[in-house]
Amino acid sequence: MQRDLADANSTITAVQGVRVGHWTEHRALTGCTVVLCDGRAVAAVDVRGGGPGTRETDLLAPGRLVRRIDAVLLTGGSAFGLAAADGVMRWLEEGGLGYDTGVARVPIVPAAVVFDLGVGDQHVRPGPDAGYAACEAASAAPVAEGDGGAGTGATVGKWAGPQYAMKGGLGSNHIDPNARLCMSSAVTGFMSTYGVDEPAGTFTDL
C-alpha cells in the first residue's frame, strides 16, 4: 500500500528547500529514501532501540563543529545499507555541495537503517548506486508514503517474535506552529503502522 498526497501537501516537502527521493526494490523488499536540504539545514536526532545502525548521527549533538547537514538517508539493508550514503555523498559532491573544510567540500549525510534482511532477499541491499538514484529521483512533490523507499521492508510488532511481524512503511509530516517550522520523517518500523489491511497486516496485502 502506498499513499500519495496529491491535494494538500502535509509531508516534509511542504517545507521550502526540502526534496525527497526514493529508491525501491519491490521484489527484494528493500529500499532507501533521501531527504535533500537545499541550502543545508540544522538537524537533530534521537537514536533508540537495542541495535541501532547509524552513520554521522553523533555530529548532530549540540556543541559539534558542523551545525548543518546536506541530506538525511533512511535505508533498508541493515548496516550494509549504510553504504547507500556513499552514493548520496557522491551526488552532492558532484553538485559542489558539502561542508567546506578549506581543502575540500565534505557532504554531511546522517543516515539510519531498518533491519529488513529477513523480509525479502537478504542478498539485495541498498548500496551507493541506490543512494545516488534516490537523489536523482528527489523532488518537492508530496512524499509518496507507506510502501516505498526505506519503508519497503519495514516491519512492526516483533516484540513477541518475528513471526508476529506486521507491515510497516514510511511517513513524514511538517508542523508550522506560530511560524516555528519543524519537519520529521520516520520509517514506521519505529513509529506508527501504515498499510495494514487483510490478512492481518502481512506482506500479502502489498
Question: Where are the regions a protein language model picked out?
Answer:
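Alpha/propeptide regions of enzymes that mature by internal proteolysis
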Residues: 1-206
